[in-house]
Amino acid sequence: MFSEKMLELGRHSSVIREIFEYSKKRKAEIGEDKVFDFSLGNPSIPTPDAFRQTLVDLIENSNPVDLHGYTSAVGDNTARQTIANNIKKRFGFDQSSDLIYMTCGAAASLTVTLKALLNEGDEVILLAPFFPEYKVFVENAGGVVKIADCNPETFQPDVDKIREQLSDRTRAIIINSPNNPTGAVFSRDNLLKIADLLSSQKHPVYILADEPYRTLAYDGVEVPYIPAIYKNTVVCTSYSKSLSIPGERIGYIAVSPECEGARDFFFAICGAGRSMGYVCAPSLFQKAAALCDTLPSDVSAYDRNRRLLYSSLSEIGYTCILPEGAFYLFVKSLEQDANAFSMMARKQELLLVPSDSFGVKGWVRIAYCTSYEQIEKSIPAFKKLYESYKVR
């Protein structure tokens, strides 16, 4: 009676969302301050004052019909040109505004781009661990997922593992750096090796650079701009994390002008958006986000949280990967079954995301985009959880 695939997706929410919904229920039962919810990557830093003021200025000083009316399907031309100019200023890369498509966030950017790129049975390589919805996006576009494990010690890409997954049906590889769930920032050296490998293929293999965490990096680590490294790159990004506006759903696709078939690729993106009912991204937020495109992200609060959580858990005895970016800590499960470990953590009111849905086993993800006070209060619970395994 209904689409079996869509019914199955609707009946079973993602693990992250399931934990988030459990959190709301549990907080209502025992009190919000007694539940340590580290499930959802929801920014805790307030939206910058400059962004809020930009919204006010636009509302007060713009023609309301123009401000709230339709833009072109590809986006507001001034916003697209502003973004292209800023890419040139920030990265020294000549991005044509005619190859920028405004979207409702990075998820929409990826779904549209995959729909534009894939024919039935085409393959997309995912670097494990990966954001779980990638698999949904690829399969919804008719693609087949191929998984290449990252280095288990550093979670940097393993070029040999990528090579093993390449075939004549490979159309793309999704690269997410800074990475969700590990917090790893992929090094320039590794990206150059991937670029060399992909360039050696007989047909174009595109990098889809998923970059919502680009501005969230610590200790001066470099986050290389991939289009400047590999010509067949499409950037899929959003302002959700950089401006702390995840609920506003605004982002863009930037097709590198150096891509093979760049113009036709962009036309296919336009066609994919049309086929999926995307009329245009929210007009007000297109304009506001573009005007605030270069606002620096204040990562000091996240950095403080990162240092506290990493040092505290390491001192207790947990094995952790020190994140270089984003706002996630990847922690080794105290038993091989991360789902079972996650359920044990619930007994201490710790809500952690098991790594199975990220494509690897034996880890949990902790989203530390929360208050410093909550992290401080959670440390005794992590200690009790650790000690409970010592006596088993």
Annotate each language-model stretch with its function:
Residues R80, V159, A209, R306, ...:
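Short amphipathic alpha-helical/adjacent loop interface patches that line ligand
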Residues F2-C104, V112, C292-V299, Y389-R392:
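N-terminal small-domain helix-loop-helix segment of the aminotransferase-like
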Residues N85, K89, R163, A340-M343, ...:
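PLP-dependent enzyme catalytic core of the Aspartate aminotransferase-like
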Residues S283-A290, Y302-S314, C320-K332, F358:
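Conserved glycine-rich beta-strand-loop-beta hairpin in the small C-terminal domain of fold type I
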Residues V65-Q201, T215-A228, V234, A381, ...:
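Conserved core of the PLP fold type I
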Residues K231-D303, R307, Y386:
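Conserved core segment of the aminotransferase class I/II
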